[in-house]
Every structure is written in structure tokens, then in C-alpha cells.
Amino acid sequence: MSAKKLFIQTLGCAMNVRDSEHMIAELTQKENYALTEDIKEADLILINTCSVREKPVHKLFSEVGGFEKVKKEGAKIGVCGCTASHLGNEIFKRAPYVDFVLGARNISKITQAIKTPKFMGVDIDYDESEFAFADFRNSIYKSYINISIGCDKHCTYCIVPHTRGDEISIPFNIIYKEAQKAVEKGAKEIFLLGQNVNNYGKRFRNEHKKMDFSDLLEELSTIEGLERIRFTSPHPLHMDDKFLEVFANNPKVCKSMHMPLQSGSSEILKAMKRGYTKEWYLNRALKLRELCPNVSISTDIIVAFPGESEKDFEETMDVLEKVRFEQIFSFKYSKRPLTKAATMPNQIDEETASRRLSTLQNRHSEILDEIVKKQENKTFKVLFEELRAGNSIAGRTDNNFLVQVEGSEELLGQFKEVKITNAKRMVLYGEIV
């Protein structure tokens, strides 16, 4: 019997990418589906959604409306992920042609969903047996691995605890075996995923070997054949000295750190319920630069959070100047349902929010130009992962710069030393040496 065709579109973060991989594995290995990039020939159309900001939620309904117009007769449409978790039955009301709704903590029920009319799975609790999935990887050379699920922080602007539930650490033996299996299949790099990875080990579903995130990094680095370990996202509150020292000194841990700032104002951080101050954040970031001079630090920043004054915004700009981030992900505050910030007084007007965002992004662009210029004539070890147009190939350095050289498919999955000859804001161009 010929395979049925599966089309899947993934929106949002790396955790969504991994969730999509899990669903692909279940469907291709257990239900006789094969992936297609042509939505018109698909028997099953999935969209894996994001709800961190309002825009992706609006995009969901425009996308599924488009799917309904082009799908072939008899094809099913499933809405999965975080927006599915928090909207639930409203999706059926607004898009009655959707066949099932599957929340972020219910992806293991995908085979049940495709067989049940108007199936809706939006629970945010987990049974530990659901940590074990069939396996599929979008990349041979890099493997995403969940180490925790959910979040206990309840930051006042964030909907994630309402869509992914409370934080649970995945048992070490499951993580280790998954990493080992990925390396046996050709992975050179593993990418550990969680809302707050460096809070690992604080809460397991049942009794398991006790270890913290630093211990986990050290244990995983013993896997023979594994060359690189990346992770996202750590929480600044849990960046103790042990963690920073393991990060700096373990040669397999990539020297790229995502440190979500959100705001440089201690008052706004308190209103956000982030748990740290501007002073704590700067202490940790500058300590990291001291321990690991070649580290690349990225961050998330929200401007125009309710009550943010010009002085508060200047505090954020001050952190930008002091830390000099290699990369920022910056956004205007987006009011999310179910969050405390949505009903806070002193919501900021759109004009002020746009001005602050432009000021932040423009200054960071200037800083980034200075940073990348200093990379010219340096030599980096690059893992090549992606073919580019014009007989080119791209990969990343240990500290996460994107590097492009002339090269062909035979370089995929290989490490090469590359000398940078022309540094641009988004890409470093170079030559293999």
C-alpha cells in the first residue's frame, strides 16, 4: 500500500521544531505516512503553533484558512502546539473545517487524534511514559533533545505555563540514551531544550538520579563521538558559579550563551516576576565574559512593558552598552490572555513602543557591526550543515557565528577550519584553510 502524504508547518521556537519531529516520527513509522512539501497532495496537514506573542496566533487562522482552500478532498487539518493548548475548542468555532486540536503537551496522542472525529487534547499534565517517542531528525548532524518540559516561573507577561504546564525534568537515563542514539546515527552536535534548562533536576515526576544542569552537561560530554553541546534557554536566576565554570571549561560545551534579559530595569524585572535584578544580571554576564572571553551572548528584550518609563528604558539601553550582546531578539510587549501583565495599569501606547524598539535595534546594529568587523582574519572551526545557493555551504562556529564558504555537499557534517575574509552583520564569509 502506498504511503499517505503528510505536510507539516512549524511556527515558533526550537521546542516546537522538536515536537514536530516527534509527530513526524509517530506518523511515518506507525501510520504509513511520508513527508511532502506539496500541501495540495497531502492527506494530512498539520500546523504546529506558537502563542508567545499575539501575531503568531493571528497567523494561525490565516494559515489554516489557506490550507482549507487548497487541500485535496478528504484531507485532514490538525492544529497543534501552544495556541492549540490555550484556545482549545475556540479553534473549532473559528475554523470548523479543522479536524483535530492537539496541545503542546499532547503530541504523543497524534495517532489517536487522526482517527477520532473532532479530537481535542489540550491537557497540560504528563505521564512519564510519554517521554518516549519514535525517533525522527530533521538534521543528521544536529539533534534536538528535550531535557525538561513546561515552566514554573509564571512571569507576568508569559503564557507558556498555561500552554506547556508546570516544569518537569526528563530523567537522565532517557536523555543520555537519546543523545547516545543520535550520535550513533551521525549527530556531531546535540541541542538541549527546555524553558529553563539550568533549572534541570529540581523536579522529576518520580524518583530519579539527582543531578543539576552542570552535572548533566558533564555526563553528556562523556559520550564518545559527540563533539558539541548547545542548549537553550537558561534562566539568569540559576546562573551560579558552578554552571558558569562548567560552561567555560568543558571543551564540548559550545561557547554561545542565551541570557534572556527582558528588561534592564530592576523595577520592571520585579513587575515581570523575573526573580533577579539588573545588578545580578550584569554580574553574571560580565563574569561569563571574564571566564570565557570568546563567548557569544544573545538575549531577549521586551520594550514597553506596562509601566515602563523612559528611565526604565534607559536602564535597558545601559545593559546593552555594558554587555554588548552578539545577538538580540527584541519585541514590543504583547498582551497575552491569562497573564497578569494583560490587566496591569499604565499600558504603553504604540507610538512609544515603536520608538523604543527602533532605538534599541538601531543601537544594537551599530554594536553588532563593530563586533563582526573584529572577526575578520580570525580562523574558526566550523561544522557545515546547510547548502546555500551559488555553490556555497554554511555552518556555525563554536560561538554560533554563521559562516559561509564556497563548497559542495561533500562538506556536510564535516568540521573545517575557516579563515574569515569578509564579515557581514548576518554572515561571516571565509575560506577553508
From Swiss-Prot:
Where along the chain is [4Fe-4S] cluster 2 bound? C151, C155, C158
The UniProt family comment states: Belongs to the methylthiotransferase family. MiaB subfamily.
Q: Give UniProt keywords alphabetically.
A: 4Fe-4S, Cytoplasm, Iron, Iron-sulfur, Metal-binding, S-adenosyl-L-methionine, Transferase, tRNA processing
**Annotated localization:** Cytoplasm
Q: What does the note under cofactor report? A: Binds 2 [4Fe-4S] clusters. One cluster is coordinated with 3 cysteines and an exchangeable S-adenosyl-L-methionine.
Keyword S-adenosyl-L-methionine included in the entry's annotation: yes
In terms of PANTHER family, this protein maps to: CDK5 REGULATORY SUBUNIT-ASSOCIATED PROTEIN 1 (PTHR43020), MITOCHONDRIAL TRNA METHYLTHIOTRANSFERASE CDK5RAP1 (PTHR43020:SF2)
Q: Which organism is it from?
A: Campylobacter jejuni subsp. jejuni serotype O:6 (strain 81116 / NCTC 11828)
Q: What is this protein called?
A: tRNA-2-methylthio-N(6)-dimethylallyladenosine synthase
